[in-house]
Design a protein with these regions (language model features):
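Bacterial Sec-dependent N-terminal signal peptides
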Residues: 1-24
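Acidic, metal/ion-coordinating pockets
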Residues: 21-279
Length: 279
């Protein structure tokens, strides 16, 4: 895929212990696409970005990937909003309409999803055809407490896949008028609570969609992972970091937990192939 204007990360394979016989699972992952509806300018000085990105290329690439593997799962780690006049003019309708064509299994909330306030966020999320998950925000307005899910369990290819999500502290990052009475809950405590719950639900794989960021001061993916156990994979975002290969962070038990992140603007889509082995 490297010869395409929309590039996909090299396939990365790693093993997770599952409750059944061996399964192969393909995961595709986007983050911080930031309303990149059209390709970036072809005259950008950065040749890695020039002419790349855009929803049509992403949709075409996904069509090819699904032709090869109809059972793949696609996730988004937030900040699909803000970054072009499409978002400014239509307040998320364009992005949501296009994402609905892509067949996401789940996505989470980035800080820019708040840019037009809670009422607009609730309106936009209610039009999505996939679940929006966030485990560490407590909503009390505009029915968001019912629209946003703390976790989802996907039954897929004979597996139970638990998905929860973490988003960043809002104070100092988002205008308070835009997040209203939304409460931020500690990501470490939330992550452990969710991992424990999903294991009690007999999930074979626990995935965290994270918009905490990589190497962020205070609370990022490294801090969260190193203080928790029971998470198998972190699909990251927020810091716009591009990983050519997976990064690993040791959890509380000293086990290396893989983390993926794919820059910004949808130039890259992460592709991971998991081999889930029998216990």
């Amino acid at each position: 895929m490297k010869n395409k204007l929309l590039m996909t990360m090299a396939v990365i394979m790693f093993c997770v212990v599952a409750a059944f016989g061996q399964r192969t699972l393909t995961i595709l992952h986007t983050n911080d696409t930031h309303s990149c509806v059209m390709p970036l300018s072809s005259v950008l000085a950065d040749t890695l970005q020039a002419g790349r990105g855009g929803f049509l290329r992403r949709i075409a690439m996904l069509r090819e990937e699904r032709a090869a593997d109809p059972d793949l799962l696609l996730f988004d780690s937030g900040d699909f909003s803000q970054g072009s006049s499409y978002y400014t003019l239509f307040k998320g309708d364009v992005e949501v309409g296009l994402m609905n064509q892509m067949g996401y299994a789940a996505g989470t909330i980035g800080n820019h999803e708040f840019d037009f306030g809670l009422e607009n966020m609730a309106r936009v999320f209610s039009h999505l055809n996939f679940p929006i998950v966030c485990s560490n925000y407590v909503f009390t307005e505009y029915n968001l407490q019912h629209i946003v899910k703390p976790y989802v369990i996907l039954k897929h290819k004979g597996l139970k896949i638990g998905v929860f999500a973490l988003s960043p502290k809002l104070a100092g990052l988002v205008d308070q008028r835009n997040y209203g009475n939304t409460q931020y809950v500690d990501p470490v405590a939330t992550a452990q609570k969710m991992a424990d719950l999903l294991h009690k639900e007999k999930c074979d794989l626990v995935i965290c969609l994270s918009h905490l960021g990589w190497e962020e001061k205070g609370m990022g993916d490294q801090e969260m992972i190193s203080h928790t156990r029971g998470i198998d994979l972190v699909l990251g975002g927020h810091s716009h970091t591009y990983f050519q290969t997976l990064r690993y962070v040791e959890n509380l038990d000293g086990n290396p937990i893989p983390v993926d992140q794919n820059g910004k603007s949808g130039i890259f889509i992460g592709k991971l192939t998991l081999q889930l082995d029998k216990k």
